Amino acid sequence: MEAIRVGFVGNPNCGKTTLFNAYTGANLKVANWPGVTVERVEGETAYKGQPLKLIDLPGIYSLTSYSIEEKVSRKCIMNNEVDVIINVVDASALERNLYLTMQLLELGKPVILALNMMDIVEERGMEIDLHRLPEMLGGIPVVPVSARKRTGLDVLMHAVVHHYEEKHKPDVVRYQEYLEEKIAVLAQKIEETYGIKENQRWYAIKLLARDEEVQKEYPIEDSNILDRLSLIHIS
């Protein structure tokens, strides 16, 4: 049976690696990502007979390619090196962590939100609406876990396998109408110019955000298009 490739993505200090290690134990393969000195850590596990290949991606705050870690993580995801993304967030600082979540949703890849540190949330008397949150995030599964106390681990892996089998992708993140018009125009131009058949929308959003890596890889030199986009900027 083919292994499901699962990427663990999250901010630094969100407990991502602790959660990763809870599944893999000492069964790890450590190397460097090609061309850089950032560690690539992989492990293996299984859930009800389904093998899983787990990849602990570097801790990042966004998918904007400013740091080596961000470039490595983004390249791994965009090159389809993972089948399912587990976005690990610190549930006690949810709003801050969801910036990366929204960027992951823009990719249109299968994403599961792992609300880590739920034990801290409960200790502080905080509440998270576990019914409303998935609706706000495009219908993705939201799973409360505690890597420290090892709770919710089976539920999370069940969600991974089910999500993979159902080929579920999040609903598209929608912006204001005038931005959507610009994104559509640019996405069409990217497809026509470079023959890209997937992720055109994401590349369009990144071009509007002045992402340097995407600007270098997919420059748009059509003056008519540029004039129509000149007043638009997504941060």
Where are these regions (language model features)?
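Canonical P-loop GTPase G-domain recognition
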Residues: 121-173
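Residue-level signature of catalytic and energy-coupling elements of molecular machines
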Residues: 19-20, 38, 56, 73, ...
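Charged, amphipathic alpha-helical segments characteristic of ABC-type P-loop ATPases involved
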Residues: 173-207, 212-221
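Conserved C-terminal guanine-recognition region of P-loop GTPase G domains, centered on the G4
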Residues: 74-141
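Conserved G1/Walker A P-loop phosphate-binding module
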Residues: 1-62
